[in-house]
From Swiss-Prot:
InterPro entries: Restrct_endonuc-II-like, tRNA_endonuc-like_dom_sf, UPF0102_YraN-like. SUPFAM superfamilies: Restriction endonuclease-like. One of its GO terms (molecular function) is nucleic acid binding. HAMAP family: UPF0102. This is UPF0102 protein Sama_3355. It comes from Shewanella amazonensis (strain ATCC BAA-1098 / SB2B). PANTHER family: UPF0102 PROTEIN YRAN. Belongs to the UPF0102 family.
Amino acid sequence: MNPGQLAEDRAMKHLCAHGLRLEARNVRYPFGEIDLVMREGRVYVFVEVKFRTPKGFGDAVQALSAAQQQRLRRAATHYLQCHRIDAPCRFDMVAITGDKLEWIKDAF
């Protein structure tokens, strides 16, 4: 398993331990990708997982660009439409830098 997959596993386990439920993982469309689709009650939570090594450039929180946010929004909209889901949603980020995990609710 590569470091990105390990980071996604760690993020998923952390979110599940805090009461969220996994709906889908690694959802890919030609115009964007969703790392994790979770649910917290009725709310669909689209999660971007970012991983950086401690010696890497910057930390994981700084790694989500405006263009990536736009692609994730577009992919999430498509996911909701394809699955005929009419529910509130939000966009979270799990940033992992080395051993440190930071969960940012409503990241954008």
